[in-house]
């Protein structure tokens, strides 16, 4: 169902973020927190 699709997408995103490294993730979190996205 939809939940399994969401879980699969989340896993792929997690792997992608891990490959890109923590820097990109931290920048994204920072811009979200400061509403600069």
Swiss-Prot record:
Keywords: Amphibian defense peptide, Antibiotic, Antimicrobial, Disulfide bond, Secreted. GO terms for cellular component: extracellular region. Disulfide bonds join 31-37. Pfam families: Antimicrobial_2. One of its GO terms (biological process) is defense response to bacterium. It is found in: Secreted. Belongs to the frog skin active peptide (FSAP) family. Esculentin subfamily. Antimicrobial peptide. This is Esculentin-2Ra. The lineage of its organism: Eukaryota, Metazoa, Chordata, Craniata, Vertebrata.
């Amino acid at each position: 169902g939809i939940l399994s699709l969401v879980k699969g997408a989340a896993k792929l995103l997690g792997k992608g973020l891990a490959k890109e490294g923590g820097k990109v993730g931290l920048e994204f979190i920072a811009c979200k927190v400061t509403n600069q996205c």
